[in-house]
């Protein structure tokens, strides 16, 4: 396989760097033909195809699916808050003298978990009402 690549690579390089239009890469040939502007009738046909009721229904269905998927993060936030305060209770039961430090860490964990839930909820509302 490696020997075949060694034989083909010089031929491919010479074909790419050649000036003949026949051996140019396909991308170089197609960019020259794209300079011709398209007819206005073709553009309006494409534009009317994109605004059908089927397309609008698909867009709204995708919007609802995305909002539902973004709402799943709110449930994860609730589970995270429960885990944080459950760990606070376990830590306080093991060492009551660290009550103040454990509580400050629990509040920090609560805030971070709640922020992630609010970001997920915000994305769901943005998908529903802004797009």
UniProtKB/Swiss-Prot annotation:
Topology in membrane: Multi-pass membrane protein
Family annotation (Pfam families): ATP-synt_C
Disulfide pattern: none
Subcellular location: Mitochondrion membrane
Keywords: CF(0), Hydrogen ion transport, Ion transport, Lipid-binding, Membrane, Methylation, Mitochondrion, Transit peptide, Transmembrane, Transmembrane helix, Transport
Presequence positions on this chain: 1-56
Principal place of residence: mitochondrion
Transmembrane region(s): 72-92, 107-127
Function according to Swiss-Prot or TrEMBL: Mitochondrial membrane ATP synthase (F(1)F(0) ATP synthase or Complex V) produces ATP from ADP in the presence of a proton gradient across the membrane which is generated by electron transport complexes of the respiratory chain. F-type ATPases consist of two structural domains, F(1) - containing the extramembraneous catalytic core and F(0) - containing the membrane proton channel, linked together by a central stalk and a peripheral stalk. During catalysis, ATP synthesis in the catalytic domain of F(1) is coupled via a rotary mechanism of the central stalk subunits to proton translocation.
Protein name listed in UniProt: ATP synthase lipid-binding protein, mitochondrial
Organism annotation: Manduca sexta (Tobacco hawkmoth)
